[in-house]
Amino acid sequence: MLETLQQMGQGFIHALTWLNLLAMVGGVTLGIVIGCLPGLSAAMGVALMLPLTFTMPTDTGLIVLGAIYCGAIFGGSISAILIHTPGTPASAATAIEGYQMTLNGQAGKALATACWSSFWGGLLSCTSLYFFAPALAQLALKFMSAEKFWLGIFGLTIIAGVSSKSIIKGLMSGALGLLVSCIGLDPIDGTQRFMFGQAFLAEGINVTCALIGLFSMSQVFILAEKKIVEREKAKKFSDKIALTKAEKKMLWPTVIRSWIIGNIIGILPGAGASIACFMGYNNAKQFSKHKEDFGHGAIEGVCGSEAANNAVTGGSLIPMLTLGIPGESVTAVLMGGLVIQGLAPGPELFTKHAAMTYTFFAGFVLVQFFMLTIGMLGCRGFAQISRLSDAILIPCVTVLCFVGSYAIHKNLSDVVVMLIFGVLGYLMRKFDLNTAAVVLALILGPISEKGLRGALRVSGGDLGCLFASPVSWVLIVLSVIGIFSPILMAKFEKKVTGGEVLEE
């Protein structure tokens, strides 16, 4: 325990360098800008900036990505409040009361509430990182090859299923990702697989290129296709922004309840902020003493939604960092960033790389304070970003996609791979398939394969080794549950969203 406290303290010392502080400010600002642009997502923003972190120290690069993540989740509330168009699915419930407050001349108050609630939801969720992540990491140290295989299968079944609207489509997306993960040289005997004579595929598909293509370039195609539809412009506002002491006192119980809800949802693989925001909103409505205000601009509704969706951020990092199971698309991209940096998500992050991990944790805490400061000071300015035309947005994102993919190895083949995955992502979204499931399978596929083949090599080919330990059986049961859980999750999500199912 004492050693952990010392590592926490050292983490804050390392996080408070000028480089890391600048990374927090820049990441939060960029995240808010991305989040408040309807059509862009936190996952897309993190994927887009991933190549730029290659030249940074590992902890600084992760802090930048974490800052973009937090900033984008809050940024989605800006357009949700001002133009009734959530910048990200995580702010869908915020639009219900937030836009009504705008119509009532309280846009500034709504934005201040969203920012204040986001800060506390995110800050409280950081406590989970400190208290639960190290404990789970110690448990993960007991995982051998067979357990790692079933852990990968568990992650694939839950994420590929729950993150899609149907079991079949979710599993199809996951299967496609597994197929793509097989491209390149066999990790055991070096046999060529699906390379078709192309030497640049020897190391497999570059995860960063796939991320940029699936999340960013595909969105460019979507925006270009919808260019003929003019987006509603953000409304101006002039009311006072600051929350009163009485309002903060009234909102505190809502913040605490939404933090608990969002944290639990974040830890569960396959769930996400889009579900948490509606659960937080519904909970705020159920416990409110002024239920008649809901639907007409209830400040508690904005608070409940934003505190819950930002509480997801800290919780969602726990399964990714400790078990290597990214719970949603954003943490899948962050996991890709770890892999690219040569770091394997799991218990080693808390032993061999403890200094880097706790620096990232400390940075994640400090990011919440920068988000509060920048959000409060820049509400009026960020609101104008929502007014940007797609004619400006599309070419800017396109240039970033090309530059980002080329910068990885300074090779045009990476640009080609990015474009191919961009087209693939566009087609998948047109056919309502989940792009996040492809990325998760692309990352988890090699982990499962190495676990399976490693276990079989040790046992001399005896399949019984896969069923020998109690941990394996626990993961098998969880995997079976994961396959069928989308049915229950879909019914639950339909209930909390009033019939509208949202995707990350």
Per-range role (PLM):
Residues V28-A42, G71-H84, I159-S164, I260-P269, ...:
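Transmembrane alpha-helix interface/packing and boundary motifs in multi-pass membrane proteins
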Residues M1-D59, P134, Q138, Q192-A298, ...:
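Helix-loop-helix hairpins and the membrane-proximal interhelical loops
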Residues C70-G75, W116-S128, L136, V180, ...:
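Membrane-embedded alpha-helical segments of transport systems
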Residues I34-A43, I81-A92, L124-S128, I265-I275, ...:
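Short helix-coil transition sites and intra-membrane helix breaks within transmembrane domains
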Residues A42-L52, L65, A80-Q100, F131, ...:
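Re-entrant/interfacial helical elements at transmembrane boundaries that shape
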Residues Y69-A80, G87, A298-L323, G327, ...:
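A structural-propensity feature for long, helix-poor, extended segments
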Residues D59-I63, Q100-S117, K289-G301, S329-A332, ...:
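Membrane-interface alpha-helices at helix entry/exit sites of multi-pass transporters
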Residues A112-I228, I340-K494:
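Membrane-embedded alpha-helical modules
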